[in-house]
């Protein structure tokens, strides 16, 4: 894969899953979180939305992600965000953990709206990190939590599943799994996805060759003015 290729790391949350047949059958997506990586670095550009599913969330699913029917009552439907979402992911390397699950749901959502998009794999290259993990660690548990523990990524803040937070964790894991690097630790300021903040990377000895770019006086002034504006909101 070319490092300049636009990578999108994606995760979804749903109303639940079908126990017999396709997991997506009779269920809907309620949250999409996606984060962009270029040149093996997070760009800070993301796509994040909650979605009103027009059906009730199963109690077991709500226990996993903490999203409720009341919370989604005023959120957009998938048709309202479909165009922006498609434009965000098209022509990208789409990184997903257990991709068949999320892709099945996404394909169902698009197929309900248009015949032009029946399978997103026709518009982007899908990479399943679960398959990568199983090749690297055959016979071991390869859930997101298990991989975070294995690669020493601190995720104690991850009390509930959430698409945007899980996408960031998965992005870190993907970079580690494809670089041979053993561990990375990042700032504890990650909040629940509903209060998402861009996460600062810890600088380790392995990164000391990177050039540190400091803000100039004008940039610092603008930054301080922005912080003042936020406090006044």
Curated annotation (Swiss-Prot):
<dbReference type="InterPro" id="IPR012337">
    <property type="entry name" value="RNaseH-like_sf"/>
</dbReference>
<feature type="binding site">
    <location>
        <position position="11"/>
    </location>
    <ligand>
        <name>substrate</name>
    </ligand>
</feature>
<dbReference type="GO" id="GO:0003677">
    <property type="term" value="F:DNA binding"/>
</dbReference>
<feature type="binding site">
    <location>
        <position position="166"/>
    </location>
    <ligand>
        <name>substrate</name>
    </ligand>
</feature>
<feature type="binding site">
    <location>
        <position position="65"/>
    </location>
    <ligand>
        <name>substrate</name>
    </ligand>
</feature>
<dbReference type="GO" id="GO:0008408">
    <property type="term" value="F:3'-5' exonuclease activity"/>
</dbReference>
<keyword id="KW-0464">Manganese</keyword>
<keyword id="KW-0239">DNA-directed DNA polymerase</keyword>
<feature type="binding site">
    <location>
        <position position="166"/>
    </location>
    <ligand>
        <name>a divalent metal cation 1</name>
    </ligand>
</feature>
<keyword id="KW-0548">Nucleotidyltransferase</keyword>
<dbReference type="InterPro" id="IPR013520">
    <property type="entry name" value="Exonuclease_RNaseT/DNA_pol3"/>
</dbReference>
<feature type="binding site">
    <location>
        <position position="11"/>
    </location>
    <ligand>
        <name>a divalent metal cation 2</name>
    </ligand>
</feature>
<comment type="function">
    <text>DNA polymerase III is a complex, multichain enzyme responsible for most of the replicative synthesis in bacteria. The epsilon subunit contain the editing function and is a proofreading 3'-5' exonuclease.</text>
</comment>
<feature type="binding site">
    <location>
        <position position="13"/>
    </location>
    <ligand>
        <name>substrate</name>
    </ligand>
</feature>
<dbReference type="InterPro" id="IPR036397">
    <property type="entry name" value="RNaseH_sf"/>
</dbReference>
<dbReference type="InterPro" id="IPR006309">
    <property type="entry name" value="DnaQ_proteo"/>
</dbReference>
<feature type="binding site">
    <location>
        <position position="11"/>
    </location>
    <ligand>
        <name>a divalent metal cation 1</name>
    </ligand>
</feature>
<keyword id="KW-0378">Hydrolase</keyword>
<dbReference type="GO" id="GO:0045004">
    <property type="term" value="P:DNA replication proofreading"/>
</dbReference>
<dbReference type="GO" id="GO:0046872">
    <property type="term" value="F:metal ion binding"/>
</dbReference>
<dbReference type="Pfam" id="PF00929">
    <property type="entry name" value="RNase_T"/>
</dbReference>
<keyword id="KW-0269">Exonuclease</keyword>
<keyword id="KW-0235">DNA replication</keyword>
<keyword id="KW-0808">Transferase</keyword>
<dbReference type="GO" id="GO:0003887">
    <property type="term" value="F:DNA-directed DNA polymerase activity"/>
</dbReference>
<keyword id="KW-0540">Nuclease</keyword>
<keyword id="KW-0460">Magnesium</keyword>
<dbReference type="GO" id="GO:0005829">
    <property type="term" value="C:cytosol"/>
</dbReference>
<protein>
    <recommendedName>
        <fullName>DNA polymerase III subunit epsilon</fullName>
        <ecNumber>2.7.7.7</ecNumber>
    </recommendedName>
</protein>
<feature type="active site" description="Proton acceptor">
    <location>
        <position position="161"/>
    </location>
</feature>
<feature type="binding site">
    <location>
        <position position="13"/>
    </location>
    <ligand>
        <name>a divalent metal cation 1</name>
    </ligand>
</feature>
<comment type="subunit">
    <text>The DNA polymerase holoenzyme is a complex that contains 10 different types of subunits. These subunits are organized into 3 functionally essential subassemblies: the pol III core, the beta sliding clamp processivity factor and the clamp-loading complex. The pol III core (subunits alpha,epsilon and theta) contains the polymerase and the 3'-5' exonuclease proofreading activities. The polymerase is tethered to the template via the sliding clamp processivity factor.</text>
</comment>
<feature type="binding site">
    <location>
        <position position="60"/>
    </location>
    <ligand>
        <name>substrate</name>
    </ligand>
</feature>
<dbReference type="InterPro" id="IPR006054">
    <property type="entry name" value="DnaQ"/>
</dbReference>
<keyword id="KW-0479">Metal-binding</keyword>
């Amino acid at each position: 894969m070319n490092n300049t290729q636009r990578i999108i790391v994606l995760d979804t949350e749903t109303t639940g899953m079908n126990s017999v047949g396709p997991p997506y059958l009779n269920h809907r997506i309620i949250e999409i979180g996606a984060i962009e990586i270029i040149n093996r670095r997070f760009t800070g550009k993301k796509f994040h939305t909650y979605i009103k599913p027009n059906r009730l969330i199963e109690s077991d699913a709500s226990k996993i992600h903490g999203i409720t029917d009341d919370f989604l009552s005023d959120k957009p439907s998938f048709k309202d965000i479909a165009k922006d979402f498609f434009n965000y992911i098209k022509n990208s390397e789409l990184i997903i953990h257990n991709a068949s699950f999320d892709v099945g749901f996404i394909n169902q959502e698009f197929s309900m709206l248009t015949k032009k998009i029946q399978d997103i794999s026709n518009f982007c290259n899908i990479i399943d990190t679960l398959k990568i993990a199983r090749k690297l660690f055959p016979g071991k548990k390869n859930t997101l939590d298990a991989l975070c523990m294995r690669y020493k990524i601190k995720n104690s803040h991850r009390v509930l599943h959430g698409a945007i937070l899980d996408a960031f964790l998965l992005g870190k894991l993907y970079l580690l799994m494809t670089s041979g690097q053993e561990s990375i630790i990042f700032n504890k300021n990650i909040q629940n996805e509903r209060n998402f903040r861009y996460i600062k990377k810890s600088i380790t000895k392995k990164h000391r060759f990177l050039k540190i770019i400091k803000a100039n006086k004008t940039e610092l002034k603008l930054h301080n003015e922005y912080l003042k504006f936020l406090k006044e909101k």
